[in-house]
Amino acid sequence: MIIDHIIKKIKLCLPIKYSEFQIHEPTFDKRDISNIKKCVESTFVSTKGCYIDSFTSKLKNITGCKKILLTSSGTSALFLALKAIDIDSCEVLLPSMTFVATANAVVNANGIPNFIDSSETSLNLCPIKLEEYLSDIAIVKNKKCINKNTGRVIKVLMVVHTYGDPVDLLSIKKITEKYCL
């Protein structure tokens, strides 16, 4: 059965004692709990406080960026990134194996999500399926990727490193360059 096959593949990606690690449940060590208590006691438990300021400062130093904007969630970060590049009424390619937040961010930023099949072995976006999809529906005009069926611009390809397994970015980069994504 396909579901058993998928579960088996997911378990192969996880640490040996996978039952000790929860994907959707937070785990906190003693230091984390101590820091959380400090935040609660300070009344800064959201998007402001000494930890936010410290982290922002460290990120500026590491990246060399003058401005850093932290968000309260990955969903918010995806939404802001998509708004910044103006995907309004454009199509966005996503892997079929992803968290709902990826597609939600696209829809909330007024984009149109299109799902590309994932690899059976890595569960990541499959470069072969991406190439097949684009060769069937895309044309490049004026350095823009256009869906010849809808007439809309395909502006973005979002990749997700499923369970921390890195996507084959080199193969995907060649494809995105070919199609001006």
Predicted regions, residues:
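Short alpha-helical
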Residues: 31, 54, 76, 100-101, ...
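Acidic active-site catalytic centers that drive phospho-/nucleotidyl reactions
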Residues: 32, 56, 117-119
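Short, flexible loop segments at the rims of nucleotide/cofactor-binding pockets, characterized by
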Residues: 45-48, 161
